[in-house]
Each structure stands twice: as C-alpha cells, then as structure tokens.
C-alpha cells in the first residue's frame, strides 16, 4: 500500500475517536523487552497527538515472579491470581509502582507525551476489599477446603475523578494495579480486571488488551484460526462451550464485562508485534480480535 493510502485509511478512525478515551492495558507478557515497551509508549503518544485520550493500565506478572525467585520465594497462583503474603506485597509494590510504572512514564515522556504515574491508592482511585478465600473440593473425599489468597483484592469502586482531571488537562495517566481498602491496607489486583473496570468507570470508548497471543483463536494451537470480530453473545457461547480457556479466560471475561458495562469495543491483540496498537486502531482489518455488543 502506498504510504499516503495508510494515512487516508486512518482518517475515519481519527475522526471517530477524536477526544474519546482509549484504555490500553500493557500486559506483562507483552512487555518482553525494553524495545517493545518503548515502541508501545511511542504509539500511545501518537494516539494522544492525533486527538484521542489514552489511559494506560500496566501489568508485570512475569517480572514480579522473577523478583520473587531472586529473593528465594516461589510464586504461587490460584486461578490466575497470585497468592500474596505481606512480603510478596512489598515485592509487588516495588516492581509495579517502583519499577514498571516509572519506566513506562519516562518512556511516554521521552516521546513527547505528558504521562503521570498513579496507583489505585492515589485519591482512592481503586477502592477494593480482600477477596474471599478460594474454595476447593477434594475429588476423592468430597471435602471442601478454603485457600486464603492473602492480600489480593477485588474492586469495590472506581473513582474516575482523578483520571478525568488528568485527561482533561492533556496528561496520559499510567495506572499500577494496586488497590486500597477502607482501612488503608494495600491489596494486589489483577491488571486485566483493573483495566476493564477503569475503562467502564471513565466511559472509555475502547479497551485494548496487549498480550502475547494473536487474539482469541478458535483452535488455541493454530494461530491461523484467529477470530477477527465477534459479538459478546457469540463469545459468551465460546466460553460456555470451553473453546476459550486457560490464560485467555480472565481476559475474555474482562472484555465481555467491559462491553456489558458500556465500553463500545474491546480488543485483544499481540503486543509483541511492533505497532500492533496502531494497526488495530487505524486499519480496517485490524490485527487481533475485536469484541463488540
Ligand atoms: C497480579 C498483578 C500484575 C498483573 C500479579 O501479582 O501478578 C494478582 O495476581 P499481568 O502482567 O497483567 O499478568 N495480581 C492478584 O496482573 O500483571
């Protein structure tokens, strides 16, 4: 395609999303190296300069696990959620708020954006409560057993005020998935859930989840079976029939919930592909899976 045609193809999208909030979730698995993070930060700045209002939520699961291993702690997950004791919570804060958040903020600023780093504690952005213990049933004895996840939270409410104030003043908010409870305790939150809930809370037009797979696949072992567009109802059927499973399940449920809460479209795309964000937003074909009502 001629370079100029790329710009012409982008125009309807630039018009449609002018001044609209776009929630972008930078997944820990998508941020494979500094170059990938830098490229995504630059694309985020481009979105801002063509008139959209990007808001970033980042993860960092793999990096937290690496830090835990270095400190001699073994990471443990139950249904995708990290079991978080006091010491793990300190590591989570250090990695997410101290390292990843500041790194994304400085990369966005380097490319000319005005990024501000926040966690869910700032201005009570993410009020959370400790999750109830996970109940498992022993297959043999049928006995019920409770497993406490520790300092893991579920979101009670999102206060969009601080985010709106920042986007209204041309800043790009960058949010760490850490919540606060009513007694000021820190809680570890799943970053996908945070992205979905904040997207709904701020009335975002789009939720874009950057991860390490091409999107939702009909056959998870075959990248050629990518589903490019799907409605929430069709997707809910795929979930019920067990076609969407494993690591894709929480992301898929987050997208379904976001659409049901009023976000116009949700996208799952491969963040390892350079400029996947721009290809998804500005081209007709897109690059990943787009979910709509
Ligand atoms: C996550 C927070 C980071 C995250 C964790 O501790 O790994 C819980 O599991 P990704 O890269 O998006 O997976 N929190 C409760 O979600 O990062």
From Swiss-Prot:
A biological process (GO) annotation for this entry? L-arginine biosynthetic process
**Binding residue positions for substrate:** 60-61, 82, 188
Q: Name one Pfam family in it.
A: AA_kinase
Location comes to:
Cytoplasm
What EC number(s) does its UniProt record assign? 2.7.2.8
Q: Name one GO cellular component term.
A: cytoplasm
Output the SUPFAM superfamilies linked to this UniProt entry: Carbamate kinase-like (SSF53633)
In which pathway is this protein known to take part? Amino-acid biosynthesis; L-arginine biosynthesis; N(2)-acetyl-L-ornithine from L-glutamate: step 2/4
Output the Gene Ontology terms for molecular function: acetylglutamate kinase activity; ATP binding
Q: Which UniProt keywords apply?
A: Amino-acid biosynthesis, Arginine biosynthesis, ATP-binding, Cytoplasm, Kinase, Nucleotide-binding, Transferase
Q: What is its main location?
A: cytoplasm
| Residue(s) at site: Transition state stabilizer | 25, 251
InterPro entries found in the cross-reference section = AceGlu_kinase-like_sf, AcgluKinase_fam, ArgB, Asp/Glu/Uridylate_kinase, Glu/AcGlu_kinase, NAGK-C
Q: Which reaction does it catalyse?
A: N-acetyl-L-glutamate + ATP = N-acetyl-L-glutamyl 5-phosphate + ADP
The job of this chain, per UniProt, is described as:
Catalyzes the ATP-dependent phosphorylation of N-acetyl-L-glutamate.
Q: Which family does it belong to?
A: Belongs to the acetylglutamate kinase family. ArgB subfamily.
What name does this protein carry? Acetylglutamate kinase
Species in which this protein is naturally found: Methanothermobacter thermautotrophicus (strain ATCC 29096 / DSM 1053 / JCM 10044 / NBRC 100330 / Delta H) (Methanobacterium thermoautotrophicum)
């Amino acid at each position: 395609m001629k370079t100029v045609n790329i710009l012409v193809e982008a125009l309807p999208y630039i018009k449609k999303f002018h001044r609209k909030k776009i929630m972008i979730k930078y997944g820990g698995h998508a941020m494979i190296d500094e170059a990938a993070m830098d490229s995504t930060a630059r694309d985020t700045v481009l979105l801002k300069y063509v008139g959209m209002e990007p808001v970033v939520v980042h993860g960092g699961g793999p990096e937290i696990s690496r830090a835990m291993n270095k400190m001699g702690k073994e990471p443990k997950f139950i249904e995708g959620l990290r079991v978080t004791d006091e010491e793990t919570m300190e590591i989570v804060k250090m990695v997410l708020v101290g390292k990843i958040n500041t790194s994304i903020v400085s990369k966005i600023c380097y490319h000319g954006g005005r990024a501000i780093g926040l966690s869910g504690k700032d201005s009570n952005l993410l009020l959370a409560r400790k999750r109830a213990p996970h109940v498992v049933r022993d297959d043999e004895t049928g006995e019920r057993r409770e497993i406490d996840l520790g300092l893991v939270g579920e979101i009670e409410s999102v206060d969009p005020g601080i985010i709106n104030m920042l986007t209204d003043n041309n800043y790009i908010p960058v949010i760490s998935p850490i919540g606060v409870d009513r007694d000021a305790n820190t809680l570890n939150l799943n970053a996908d859930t945070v992205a979905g809930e904040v997207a709904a809370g701020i009335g975002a037009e789009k939720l874009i989840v950057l991860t390490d797979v091409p999107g939702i696949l009909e056959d998870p072992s075959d990248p050629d079976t990518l589903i490019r567009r799907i409605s929430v109802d069709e997707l809910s059927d795929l979930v019920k029939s067990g076609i969407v499973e494993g690591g894709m399940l929480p992301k898929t449920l987050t997208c379904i919930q976001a659409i049901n809460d009023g976000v116009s479209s949700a996208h799952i795309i491969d963040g390892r592909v350079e400029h996947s964000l721009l290809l998804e937003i500005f081209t007709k074909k897109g690059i990943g899976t787009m979910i709509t009502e």
